[in-house]
Amino acid sequence: QGSLSLGTSLNKLGYDHVFFVKLASGSVYADLISSGNEEIITRTINNILLDGPSLRTYRHAPNVGKRKSWAAADAVSRAIEISEISLLDDENYSGILKDSTWGFENIYFENATMHFGKTLDNWVINNVLFKVLYPAEFHGQSAVEAAVQLSNEFLPNKNVTKEIVIETHEPAIRIISNKEILNNASDRDHSLEYMVATALLLGDVTSDSYEESFHGFKEIEMLRKKITVVENPNFTETYYEFDKREIANSIYLNFEDGSKSEKITVRYPIGHPKRRDEAVPLIKEKFIKNTSNHFEPEHANKIWNAIIDLEMDDDFNKLINILIDG
């Protein structure tokens, strides 16, 4: 999925990225249940292509909704269903990808080619981004960090702040920059302006911050209207460079007297591979907290340590036994 996403941008075409989740999940699941039968794997992939991608309308205003929270799970569910169906003897639909009239690329990609942006190795898994500190869409994570750092300078000067400027990369502008009316929490956690306004005012962002019932909601709504988002071409360039993969944002304040605040720049948000050492203790803390409904902290800590000690060649049952027995 990651390698396909690096080579083919579905969101630029108006489709949701979970289509590649479906393709990848279906391929792997078909391999598992068929003991590597190439005919069944191919049939699964082609049946998924026949399904086509879903629109990403539910990720953008004014149609943002909770579907974006279950879209990936839905894609995996459908992938498993298609894999099971593809065990049955059926056509392989071998022309689905390239057919010049009714083929997938012709219909959905306007004859552009779907391709891998990276070889199928461990690069993607080694570069996974962990959402550690803030419940915010990842293109805005470093902006939230920068805003939290700038909060101490902003708060005593909020009444004389004329403008808040965010310098960001092009994908962030395309995907999460939204100053229009935000209809619900799903809208707000995909608004760069909203999350930055929250971080400046409160020095933090939590899931409660996105609710209309949140105590600071009205002030956040007023402040986000002062925010200007501009592209920093360097940030866009380094976003796409494989050896960097920055997700950079800068924030500064323009005051009414013409002066400016310090510009705060965060190039790699916490959870990025470049900041793994900082992230691991926080990931553990998040794991313990999020499993507290099921396990006592001591038990959860034992599970964490056992998972960390797993080796790549360990039997899968060992992982299951850890979850059962701790």
Where are these regions (language model features)?
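Terminal-appendage/accessory-domain detector
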Residues: 63-77, 84-326
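Glycine-rich, mobile lid/loop segments that gate access to catalytic sites or pores
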Residues: 1-77, 81, 96, 100-101
